Curated annotation (Swiss-Prot):
The keyword Isomerase does not apply. The lineage of its organism: Eukaryota, Metazoa, Chordata, Craniata, Vertebrata. This is ADP-ribosylation factor-related protein 1. SUPFAM superfamilies: P-loop containing nucleoside triphosphate hydrolases. Trans-Golgi-associated GTPase that regulates protein sorting. Controls the targeting of ARL1 and its effector to the trans-Golgi. Required for the lipidation of chylomicrons in the intestine and required for VLDL lipidation in the liver. It comes from Rattus norvegicus. NCBIfam families: small_GTP. It holds the Pfam family Arf. Its main location: Golgi. GO terms for biological process: gastrulation; Golgi to plasma membrane protein transport; intracellular protein transport; protein localization to Golgi apparatus; retrograde transport, endosome to Golgi.
Amino acid sequence: MYTLLSGLYKYMFQKDEYCILILGLDNAGKTTFLEQSKTRFNKNYKGMSLSKITTTVGLNIGTVDVGKARLMFWDLGGQEELQSLWDKYYAECHGVIYVIDSTDEERLSESKEAFEKVVSSEALDGVPILVLANKQDVETCLSIPDIKTAFSDCTCKIGRRDCLTQACSALTGKGVREGIEWMVKCVVRNVHRPPRQRDIT
């Protein structure tokens, strides 16, 4: 009887854990996106003041529960010298969120180069990628078609994995929930990367 009840409890309350990398150049808005995600999906999370967010040196970690999935976010620093550390996390991850500052046209080619390295990595084969064109609340930002055109060289390297380019404003929260919900659907159905662990709450 205990085994039956224990199994039922696990079935009803377990969370499948998925590791999601948040990548992109410095000042693209990765940490702001992470904070907005935690605020939108964790009822009791107060969150830090978005005006106090500074450039990430190293790693920020956050957790969000969406249905039966638990997303463990790893927000990695985007400075050039830190990008060499990104691939150390690839084997463990189930999905990638790549954040682009759509107001910074001068660094767009630099962002594309970094993205190209990400999608070219064999360690990320089949891993879904959400490309967020961030800062869409700014009038002078590049549009989604502009971003897609600038990154068109990378299309063939994306392969058969799930990939979505979406407008977002991490500051206002627009597009945050939609992006996370899309990622959850992708990681849950990706049989090539099963959940990292079972976590019972």
